[in-house]
């Protein structure tokens, strides 16, 4: 039986020394949104709690300003 070794999760924001997550940085935010438009939980991404809260707030602000969609595109 083959053993499955999961790669170690790490917080990208801590490693890069990010102080604040910006809602205008769409490339970063898109990496933490699923195909259906949901915010991916920190237990999957490995993001620390402090940055996960900032991430959620930034994604919600970007959605409110129509920079990011709330859901995936309907009808496809």
Curated annotation (Swiss-Prot):
The keyword Ribosomal protein applies. Transmembrane segments: none annotated. GO terms for molecular function: small ribosomal subunit rRNA binding; structural constituent of ribosome. It holds the Pfam family Ribosomal_S18. Coiled coil: none annotated. One of its GO terms (biological process) is translation. GO terms for cellular component: cytosolic small ribosomal subunit. Keywords: Ribonucleoprotein, Ribosomal protein, RNA-binding, rRNA-binding. The keyword Zinc does not apply. It comes from the Bacteria. Belongs to the bacterial ribosomal protein bS18 family. NCBIfam families: S18. Part of the 30S ribosomal subunit. Forms a tight heterodimer with protein bS6. PANTHER family: 30S RIBOSOMAL PROTEIN S18 (PTHR13479), SMALL RIBOSOMAL SUBUNIT PROTEIN BS18M (PTHR13479:SF40). Binds as a heterodimer with protein bS6 to the central domain of the 16S rRNA, where it helps stabilize the platform of the 30S subunit. This is Small ribosomal subunit protein bS18. It comes from Azotobacter vinelandii (strain DJ / ATCC BAA-1303).
């Amino acid at each position: 039986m083959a053993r499955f070794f999961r790669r170690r999760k790490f917080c990208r924001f801590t490693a890069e020394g990010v102080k604040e997550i910006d809602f205008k940085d769409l490339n970063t935010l898109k990496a933490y949104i699923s195909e259906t438009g949901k915010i991916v939980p920190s237990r999957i991404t490995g993001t620390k709690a402090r940055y996960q809260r900032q991430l959620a707030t930034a994604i919600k602000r970007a959605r409110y300003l129509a920079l990011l969609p709330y859901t995936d595109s309907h009808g496809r």
